[in-house]
Structures are given as structure tokens and as C-alpha cells.
Amino acid sequence: MYVQERVSLMTILKKIRILDFSHVYYGPYATMIMADLGAEVIKVEPVWGEVAREYDPKFGGVSQVFHYLDRNKRGVTLNLKDPKGKKIALELASKSDVVIENFSRGAMDRLGLGYEDIKKVKPDIIYASLSGFGLDGPYAKRPSFASIASSMSGWYRLTGDLVDPEGPPVMPAEWHGDLDPGLYAVIGMMGALLHREWTGEGQHIDVSQLDCMIAQNGIPITGYLMSGMLPYEHRQKRTGLRFMGPFEASNGWVFIHTSPRMTERLMKGMGVEKLESRANLENWTAERTVKEVVDALIAVGVPAAPINSLKEVVEDPHVNHRGMIVSVEHPDAGTVRSPNHPIKYSRVKPEMRSAAPLLGQHNEEVLTDLGYSAEEIEGLREAKIIT
């Protein structure tokens, strides 16, 4: 009975409507999270479709990026440069709680869809502008991608320093310069929604990729500002963490994370009385399988884990017990399996309600909700204002 009740409870953002003009990773990741939490997200694409549909590899003619980031959304197409398309966008905005965009600076203003324009039809709108460098400052008009923010924030240099301070910068897996700022955009939208609940006021949210990635590097930056020393210089002064990092086992790799206080536990797990160098630990792991190393160390309270491939991740029994892989049916791609929303709530349940939309899939129902007749909708299609 409890499980049935839990599933039937309304989701956190069920009454929130988001008009989503964003594209690629940055904005769509933020709105995906909001949609997972129950918000109605109306994704607005150009009549030819947003560029992220076209990235390889494709499944059912649509990229893996779009399948993942645009699930749980309703999809409409609009030619925003046409006055009738702009009119529809303003009508949708007037019935929305949040507008989000990540166009180049000034693009929405030129279309007549900037914050001040939307405020005229929805005074308490929350308007989230996502960009590389923010709405002001010397770099505000520069183009940006995730890699640019990660480079300028020190992220790539810090990662390279972990390998070799004298070597090249290292680009980590995945686009954290998009995904991390996307999470900050979620925080910003949720905070603004709460502020509006208290005060009745909407506001303009300015989310900069560079600002967010600097915040993500907050600890090493704080250390540098207080000491004048870079993180690798601090590490060179310490010896207690020499037993932390990736180690090769006989059939793969493990990551062992110790602190100076764990050395005795580490020796106990290894079954040795002396541990004089990193080479001793490397030799020990090399003679054992990944499972043997991990089992021996976690038995004595030393954090250790296999360094998994994606195949091993999705087959991991704990991952599946936690419900982290979910499925949804797509009309062209078939079954789409992807990671679930990661947060578990005791009273609500984020849901995989629908696959990413086909191009213009919800044009008719969204326009009908606005009061457009079937004849008017067909006229918009013939005029190429919608698909």
C-alpha cells in the first residue's frame, strides 16, 4: 500500500510550466532535471530541428544526446523570426512560470523575446539566461562551449597537474563545462520559484558557465589565494596520501583512496607489516584480481572500488538495485535505456513519463490549448511557421 501511495503522489514540480528555448547540453540538461521532477517542459525548436538531434551516433534518426537530455518534454517547432511565431512564443510565455534560453547574447532581445519583453505579458516570470560568460563583463559577447569554460576556469590544467604538472592539460570525460552549470541553473530556477512563492516577484537569472566552473574549483582556488601555492605544490609537501590513486590489478584497475590515518588499515588489508613505498602497493595489487583487491580492502574499511567500464557500470547489481537504469519507448528508436533521475524521495517519485519528442510532435495539442483551431494550425504549417 505504501509503494502504491508513493507512486500516486504528485511530483514536486507538477504545477510548474517551463518554456524551454535552450539547445545542445547546457540548458536541456537543466530542463531535463526539472522535467524529471514533474515540471511541464515545452521545448521550442526551429522548424528544422535543434542541432543536438543530429549528433552521432543516432538511434531511430536521433542522437543519444537528444534521447537523454530531452526526455519527459513536449516538443513544438516555431519560426521565431516570423511575427506569428513570435506571437505564439509570447502566448506560451504568458502561461509559463519559467523561460529558459542559451542563445548568444542579445539574440532573444533581437527577436523581441528578451526578459523585458516577456515581463510585459507575464510580470512574475522567472527568466533564466544561460551563457558562457554571463550578461555583462569584457567577455560577455564571446562564443563559448563547455570546453572553453573548463579551460578558462583552470579545470583542464588542474586535471593535467594530477598526471604531470610539467605536462599538457588533460580534458576529463564528459562535458562538465555544460553539465555542472546546468545543475547551477536548476538551483537558480528552484531558488527563484521559492522566492516568487514568498514575494510574488519574478526575476532574471544570469547563469555563466565560467562563473559556475570557477565555483566548482572553489577549494583549490581558495587554497591558492590563501597560500600562493598550487594544488600540486601542496601535494608535493605531503607524503601521507601516496597510497591514493589508480592501481593496476591482474585483470583491470582499482582506485584506492586512503588518508594518512588509514595506513595501518591498508597494511592489515594487504596482510603486511610494512608498507614503505607506493611500489609495494603496486606489486600487491598486480598479483591479485580487481575483486580480490577490493574485497580485501573494504573488509578493513579502506575505500576501494573497481574502475569500471560503461559495460560494467550498467551491469552492476547495486546500480540496478537502485533503479538507476530505466527504459522508455520511442516511436522510431524503440526501447531507450538511460540513467534515471538519481535522487530518491520518501514522498514523491521522479518518473520517466515519455521519450524525447519527435520534431514538432506536440504542435497540435499545445496550439489547441492556446485556442488555435485546426484550420489555423494547418495555416501555420503551410506558412512554415511550424512543421
What role is predicted for each listed range?
Residues 2-17, 242, 246-249, 257, ...:
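Terminal low-complexity tails and localization/encapsulation signals of metabolic enzymes
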Residues 59-62, 238-240, 336:
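Short solvent-exposed loop/turn micro-motifs enriched in small/polar/acidic residues
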Residues 101-102, 275-276, 346:
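Short beta-strands and strand-loop turn motifs
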Residues 151-295, 304, 323-333:
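Acidic, glycine-rich segments within the central catalytic cores of soluble metabolic enzymes
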Residues 296-319:
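Conserved PLP cofactor-binding pocket of PLP-dependent enzymes
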Residues 2-198, 291, 358, 364-387:
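N-terminal helix-loop segment corresponding to the beta1-alpha1 unit
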